């Protein structure tokens, strides 16, 4: 551990990734003070996959766009590093993404600079480079798309650019991590969505040919990468190598897209004898029709959209050589073990 790391402030620490960030800092940096800033408190009941004591974690409830709220948390935590993992879920209105991902991040950067925080680690997304086309072994030299596919990744890219622009080796050092396809214990979006679709009888349908490799990443590995980044960005021997850089974070073992979903469904007892396969062009057409009808006639969110079809059917895997070399990152939990942990957590019924 870097001797400089004494205190970490985790923005969004009550969320899915946030709880795993607390856990990994607790495990790997036992002498580091951990503070959480979030709009919601830490959960009262935790899965067995979390060993930290919530009562030992200093907590601040606040608004990321409030100078005062952020200043209070930074001043009282006396943090060396801020880990900013707060972000709304997919599928929400654009104004929410703008407020949290863009305005909130810019406010956090401004306050951190004024209060002389040493470093900030930002949780970006591998989706910031996705334009609907195949992403094959992409590295950090790939550009942002001219037109983003969705509001979430558009604002994550804008926030990432702001974080990179704020990097100053004489003041606030910054680094961005781009995890892909996060899953694991505590997930409240991917797994619940899969379970809901199975209950509606949708597990028998397959969009695309399932020949597309996809990066699923175990959440504990993503949290490990953040701990490494926080340590490296304070270490005098490594900080110049990672300051102002972006890093893809994956399990380094892309698998066919539907593998994870069918493993979850099988655990729940949904074992389909056959699949109704919708070729990509057909699925995409249905996506456009569904989106039009839902928004213009039914006045509700569509169940299937062109964006979702493209995400499901595209090849999307990334090269993590840079993270291995400069962060010393390697996925400690393999894909099969991560899926088993997730299934075990699902059966806890928390």
UniProtKB/Swiss-Prot annotation:
- Which Enzyme Commission numbers does its entry carry? 1.1.1.170
The principal location of this protein is: endoplasmic reticulum
Q: What happens when the gene is disrupted?
A: Impairs growth.
The protein's annotated pathway: Steroid biosynthesis; zymosterol biosynthesis; zymosterol from lanosterol: step 4/6
* InterPro entries tied to this protein: 3Beta_OHSteriod_DH/Estase, NAD(P)-bd_dom_sf
Protein induction: Expression is repressed by amphotericin B and caspofungin. Expression is also repressed during biofilm formation.
GO MF terms listed in the record are: 3-beta-hydroxysteroid dehydrogenase (NAD+)/C4-decarboxylase activity; 3-beta-hydroxysteroid dehydrogenase [NAD(P)+]/C4-decarboxylase activity
Xref: Gene3D superfamilies:
NAD(P)-binding Rossmann-like Domain
Give binding positions for substrate.
125, 152
Q: Which CDD domains match?
A: 3b-HSD-NSDHL-like_SDR_e
Key word Lipid metabolism present: yes
Enumerate the SUPFAM superfamilies for this protein: NAD(P)-binding Rossmann-fold domains (SSF51735)
Q: What class of enzyme is it?
A: oxidoreductase
What are the subcellular locations of this protein?
Answer: Endoplasmic reticulum membrane
Please tell me where NADP(+) binds in this chain.
12-18, 63-64, 85-87, 152, 156, 179-182
| Gene Ontology biological process terms from the UniProt entry | ergosterol biosynthetic process
Q: Which domain of life is it from?
A: Eukaryota
As for membrane topology, the entry says: Peripheral membrane protein
- Role noted for this protein: Sterol-4-alpha-carboxylate 3-dehydrogenase; part of the third module of ergosterol biosynthesis pathway that includes the late steps of the pathway. The third module or late pathway involves the ergosterol synthesis itself through consecutive reactions that mainly occur in the endoplasmic reticulum (ER) membrane.
Which family does this protein fall into? Belongs to the 3-beta-HSD family.
State whether it acts alone or in a complex, and with which partners, per the record. Heterotetramer of ERG25, ERG26, ERG27 and ERG28. ERG28 acts as a scaffold to tether ERG27 and other 4,4-demethylation-related enzymes, forming a demethylation enzyme complex, in the endoplasmic reticulum.
Q: What is this protein called?
A: Sterol-4-alpha-carboxylate 3-dehydrogenase ERG26, decarboxylating
Q: Which organism is it from?
A: Candida albicans (strain SC5314 / ATCC MYA-2876) (Yeast)
């Amino acid at each position: 551990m870097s001797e400089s790391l004494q205190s970490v402030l985790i923005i969004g620490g009550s969320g899915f990734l946030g709880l795993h960030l607390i856990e990994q800092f607790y495990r790997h940096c036992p002498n580091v003070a951990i503070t959480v800033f979030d709009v919601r408190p830490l959960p009262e009941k935790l899965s067995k996959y979390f060993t930290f004591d919530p009562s030992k974690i200093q907590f601040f409830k606040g608004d990321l766009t409030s100078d005062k709220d952020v200043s209070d948390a930074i001043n009282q935590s006396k943090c060396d590093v801020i880990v900013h993992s707060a972000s709304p879920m997919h599928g929400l209105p654009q104004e929410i993404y703008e407020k949290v991902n863009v305005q909130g991040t810019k406010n956090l950067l401004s306050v951190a600079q004024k209060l002389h925080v040493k470093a900030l680690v930002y949780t970006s997304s591998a989706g910031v480079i996705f334009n609907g086309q195949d992403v094959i072994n992409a590295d950090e030299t790939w550009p942002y798309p001219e037109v983003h596919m969705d509001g979430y990744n558009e604002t994550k890219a804008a926030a990432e650019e702001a974080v990179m622009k704020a990097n100053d080796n004489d003041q606030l050092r910054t680094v961005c991590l781009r995890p892909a396809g996060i899953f694991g214990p505590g997930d409240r979006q991917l797994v619940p969505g899969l379970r809901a679709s199975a209950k509606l009888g949708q597990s028998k349908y397959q969009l695309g040919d399932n020949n597309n490799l996809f990066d699923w990443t175990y959440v504990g590995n993503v949290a490990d990468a953040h701990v490494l980044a926080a340590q490296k960005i304070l270490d005098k021997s490594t900080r110049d190598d990672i300051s102002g850089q972006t890093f893809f974070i994956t399990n380094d073992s892309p698998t066919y897209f539907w593998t994870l979903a069918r493993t979850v469904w099988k655990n729940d007892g949904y074992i389909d004898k056959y699949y109704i396969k919708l070729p990509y062009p057909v699925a995409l057409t249905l996506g456009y029709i569904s989106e039009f009808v839902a928004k213009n006639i039914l006045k509700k969110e569509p169940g299937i959209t062109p964006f979702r079809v493209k995400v499901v059917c595209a090849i999307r895997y990334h090269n993590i050589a840079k993270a291995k070399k400069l962060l010393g990152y390697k996925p400690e939990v393999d894909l099969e073990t991560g899926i088993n942990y997730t299934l075990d957590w699902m059966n806890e019924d928390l």
